[in-house]
Regions:
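Short glycine-enriched, charge-decorated loop/helix-capping segments at active-site entrances
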Residues: 143-147
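Secreted, luminal/periplasmic, and some membrane-associated catalytic domains
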Residues: 15-33, 37, 141, 159-337
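Short glycine-rich loop/turn motifs that provide flexible caps or phosphate-binding loops at active sites
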Residues: 3, 10, 177, 195, ...
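Beta-strand elements within well-structured catalytic alpha/beta cores of enzymes
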Residues: 1, 44, 126-133, 149-153, ...
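His/Asp/Glu-rich, glycine-adjacent segments
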Residues: 2-141, 214-219, 223-230, 234-250, ...
């Protein structure tokens, strides 16, 4: 979207990837410097509101979620507000728990819309980028989500569009993917483990995956998985193994998908249209890592949409009460049932589910979006 380049050139090969030198899987990094290539907003007076890879971006105004972390393991939820608009004072605290997790819903999107409208009116940027996440939630929870969610995000978008028109700006709507119904999960790392290719370490907090000691493992991201190999001579063996697994549509070389980047896996697995990849690598839930039952987007070695669900409200209320009383505890309320997930994305699908641009003389191909914005900016 921002560069007009393919992932092979801009380097963002997924929501996370394996860092080979440190032998760590890193998910949901936010440094803008991870994006390789010129972004269309460089050299333009820009406001970036909750856009991904927002930290340290070369823009004049921005806001992004970022908790404070204490040395005792405590966490205080907050945002980085670099808008000079004092957003929390005017709008109240950002509703972090509705941004992601079992309570993810409308309040976070409404707050972002209101914040963006305020920045538009007060700062009048040449360009503003605003991410409204609301449709990501129920369209992953359910195969047939209520269309009320569309009407809700439409009202939030209206808040931003009204503010844009007040400063004579042109509103553009862009979506990088469409969520499709799914009915089955493929635990690709369990397949690799059962074949003796994936290594784990057992300990007091469950089994931990050891990427650096594994012959093969997968970093999963919705319907796509990067498969990393310790030795590329294993390529044919692993490809045959995974292609024989139910729910896997294809296993290809990254160059075939414009993913030929140093951060990419040695193979790319694609799910069937009605399937998605779970990151699960343990073979018995009794030995699942302690973070598996929590919302922990940075520690999990793969994307986990089960974080949108909850085991039971009673258990969650008990954990909240324990936290308020000062007990040291973990919020282990996330189910280990990948079959709950109702929607996913990542494949090239029908036109109804592909990337979308709405605006005057909008391009049909998403790779033309950066060039389109530059043209609107007169660059």
């Amino acid at each position: 979207l921002l560069t007009g380049l393919t992932p092979a050139k801009h380097g963002i090969v997924g929501n996370g990837w394996y860092e080979r030198e440190s032998a760590e899987v890193r998910f949901w990094q936010q440094s803008n410097r991870l994006i390789q290539g010129e972004k269309f907003y460089e050299g333009v007076q820009t406001a970036k509101m909750f856009w991904w890879f927002n930290q340290h971006a070369p823009v004049q105004w921005s806001a992004t979620p970022k908790p404070h972390y204490g040395c005792d393991g405590s966490k205080v939820f907050d945002i980085i507000d670099q808008t000079q608009c004092d957003l929390v004072r005017h709008l109240g605290p950002f509703p972090f728990f509705s941004f992601w997790g079992p309570n993810a819903g409308l309040p976070a999107t409404q707050w972002i819309a209101d914040a963006t409208a305020r920045v538009l009116r007060e700062k009048r940027p040449e360009l503003a980028l605003c991410y409204l996440p609301h449709l990501d939630y129920d369209f992953q929870r359910y195969q047939q989500p209520s269309m009320d969610r569309v009407r809700e995000v439409d009202r939030c978008a209206g808040v931003v569009i009204d503010a844009a028109r007040q400063i004579d700006a042109i509103p553009i709507v862009v979506s990088e993917y469409g969520l499709v119904p799914v009915k089955r999960a493929v635990a690709i790392n369990r397949v690799l483990r059962q074949a003796g290719l994936l290594a784990v370490r057992s300990g007091p907090f469950g089994e931990m995956m050891l990427p650096g000691d594994s012959q093969a493992f997968a970093v999963v991201d919705h319907q796509v998985a990067h498969v990393y190999l310790a030795d590329r001579t294993l390529r044919s063996e692993v490809q045959r193994l995974l292609e024989g697994e139910e729910g896997v549509a294809a296993v290809v070389c990254p160059d075939e998908l414009n993913l030929g980047h140093a951060r990419s896996g040695d193979l790319i697995a694609l799910a069937q249209p009605d399937a998605w990849f779970s990151y699960y690598y343990w073979l018995d839930d009794r030995f699942a890592p302690d973070f598996a039952r929590t919302v922990d987007i940075h520690r999990k070695p793969g994307y986990d949409p089960c974080e949108l669900f909850i085991t039971s409200k009673a258990r969650a209320m008990m954990r909240v009460a324990q936290k308020k009383l000062g007990f040291r505890m973990k919020m282990d309320v996330i189910p280990l049932d990948a079959g709950l997930v109702g929607g996913s994305h990542g494949l090239v699908n029908t036109p109804d589910h592909n990337p979308l641009v709405i605006g005057p003389d909008a391009p049909e191909d998403i790779y033309g979006f950066a060039r389109y914005v530059r043209r609107l900016l007169g660059r």
